[in-house]
Amino acid sequence: MLSKYIKELTEYGKRTGLLPECEQTYAVNLLLDCFQEDSYEDPGEVEERPLEDILKDLLDEAVKRELLTDSVAYRDLFDTKLMNCLTPRPAQVQETFRRKYDENPEEATDWFYQFSQNTDYIRRYRIKKDQKWKIDSPYGELDITINLSKPEKDPKAIAAARKSASVTYPKCQLCFENEGYAGRGDHPARETHRIIPITINDSKWGFQYSPYVYYNEHCIVFNSQHTPMKIERATFVKLFDFVKQFPHYMLGSNADLPIVGGSILTHDHFQGGRYTFAMEKAPVEKTVTISGFEDVQTGIVKWPLSVIRLSAADADRIIELADHILKTWRGYTDEEAFIFAETDGEPHNTITPIARKRGDLYELDLVLRNNITTKEHPLGVYHPHAELHHIKKENIGLIEVMGLAVLPARLKEEMELLKKYILENKEITTNEKIEKHASWVAEFLPSYPQVNAENIDRILEEEVGKVFVKVLEDAGVYKCTEKGRQDFLRFLNTL
């Protein structure tokens, strides 16, 4: 059967353009070596099957031959090794991308996105498992996702990694050294990972897609050096350098401080893609004029977080104003609004910036952030408050800021259980997995005159969405109230 599965895989490679006809024998021999097998019998014609099914059979065969431990982490390491037998080398990929880019940047990214799926670097069959829905809110239509495509940490792999000497190569999952890396129990295989080198702000950066695709064409742009995240004038220059090269993509950066930043603060990187987030659709509700920057349209966006939108035909003018706003905000304290630039020498104010091209104008959204903590809010005053942690307690990073909730995988099972308990009128507090949701359910359930098997799913989706709106409102340094707007304008007046 091994010969049949190998033939199916190489036929898939030819069908998707990964493998030229003249390399089929070469790929077959590489695959045989992965299985420590010496001979191959051509099975003749084979049926066309989904990649997931072919890989499953190959992995089962490898387990049978005791070539790998049967767990998700080790199966992922092994199937990436198999797919690399079909994947063109980096120079070929870069050359194809450049050739297409010279004709049309969109054509280049379309090709590379498809390529990243065909190599199984983006595992399409896992992405499909993600639960996604939209909800209406006072701020427009928001996206809610429960992320199921990122594999849970594998206990066997973690235990094995603990026993082995600590490895510090690659330094992190964003480093250039990941390209071609076989991976290990605690680090994903990246043999099929291909990086497109790009130049931004006169320095070498890389362009890739996120293997977990939280939204369409979710890309990552990262420094070739392992250097920490830092929001500064150069950040705005880099964002616009990228948008000028790929005007059909938006690009943003996580903030550079804990709590309000993303999960990786140690490696300078941005995230972007081809998706219109709710925040981009949100209108400017109040325009302001900044002295000396009359040529830059400036305004407060109707959004739960505190957003200043700048737009102009000249990106350099936006960069100058953004730098002025950033420097002012870094040092800004307003006790009445509970904004403190620093306490005990620890800085609190930073910005989450997002750049895009809209028609003939360049646009930059500056989201004001502050990571101060108090006894009442030990995880952050401008962070989801404790009563919302049953749904979301993780950092509110760039993707959430723009209106897309990335909720933890645990919610899938918890919502299924809640549904059952609500429909069967069972006491939620008796189940330790879902007792944390009890007071929330008690609060919203009375507002629905009828709850049945037909509408329970939508009710839970709506209510989870309402919690996400509150999460975003908690993260806003200036609330969407009359006082909040006055406080916001007081800051803008200092500019």
Which residue stretches match the model-derived regions?
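Beta-rich nucleic-acid/ligand-interaction surfaces
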Residues: P258-T266, D344-T350
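Active-site microenvironments that recognize anionic phosphate/pyrophosphate groups
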Residues: M1-V221, Q225-P228, K302-P304, I318-A322, ...
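Helical scaffold of the NTase/Pol beta-like nucleotidyltransferase catalytic core
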Residues: E191-R194, H226-L251
